């Protein structure tokens, strides 16, 4: 005969945990409500078959993990994101060698060997992010690691360009896993006030990876050939996959409670036990609802749409400017740069936009400086300063933008919000650089970069609008997830 399991009946919500709420759920001296006739009535009792957290201090809840354990998870996810973006441009210096080997004569096809990988960043999250919110983050990390390594091997041993391109885009889809669900992992581990530094570390990968990738890739392809680029990426991904498998744990609240309910059903024999957050839906219904969630956020939430467009344009600018460096800096042997970002705690999501408000407008300034000084052959240090300003401004648009989306939608929908962001951002990174040749051949570096500067200038009011009206917009344009 089964016994009633001992479990939490308190009905604690995750927002109570985040706020540090404490309730004495065992006190029977609480005042009962009165009926309309003035008699005492009993409050509804918690369902004994619903499995919940064991109070706000439950050690199984990711918010209550040790600081070291939280930082370990953020570090692994951030390194995985950096490695994924490193692969985006690390192969670029070897693309010409691949073209010679496979007899590629089309410049567009050569460019696709790089851009299709970044396009995978937009396609993968449409499925991976929703699945992570249904089945957990950890299984998606493991799946993406395995698929990425398999198709990176395929890239390294490709025998024709068609095979290479297919393997490349699938590898990009798999590499998007950490980028699309990493924000959800951070939201699972930290309350909003503690989330800034972790999100800054996580968000720097998409900016730093494309910068250092060509430096490493140029050295590798020149000395040992383009295929070794993928072998090195395979070694790196193998190390990260091993560390992920050995050290990471599940952080999705719903999945943790579901596993707890499953364990208790086996221990007690009570098949009626269910996790508190379980929905009365079939697996197919939950999957369909989760898959359309990023698209709904993108269509119905102006916050997600405009922040994604703004960060996407600046993300694409980084790739586009790379195409002009060989001609502008052909006499310069070494380029050095540094970036760093810091985000402070914020009591409301819109306060994350302070740095974007004030530093976002310097990006078009950098484009104007870079374009016209390069056009007029000013000393090379001046265009370098212009590109540094572009990079610095982009840093403080992309990172605060991602933190804002995670804070605005919380642990429940952070992965879907990031997926929507990647859906817009990644095509800019994949295809904006393809416009470089017609843009600069017709307009020159001066007016070509000025056009880009005016486009980014048009988006500078976005953080100012959301800083003032963001909370009202979030309330008015609530998306049924």
From Swiss-Prot:
Stated induction or repression of this protein's expression: Expression is induced by the final product trichosetin and not by the trichosetin cluster-specific transcription acticator TF22.
Keyword Transmembrane attributed: yes
Family matches, as Pfam families: MFS_1
Key words, A-Z: Cell membrane, Glycoprotein, Membrane, Transmembrane, Transmembrane helix, Transport
Topology of the protein relative to the lipid bilayer: Multi-pass membrane protein
Cited function: Efflux pump required for efficient secretion of trichosetin or other secondary metabolies produced by the trichosetin gene cluster. Plays a crucial role in detoxification of the toxic trichosetin in Gibberella fujikuroi cells.
Name recorded for this polypeptide: Trichosetin biosynthesis cluster MFS transporter
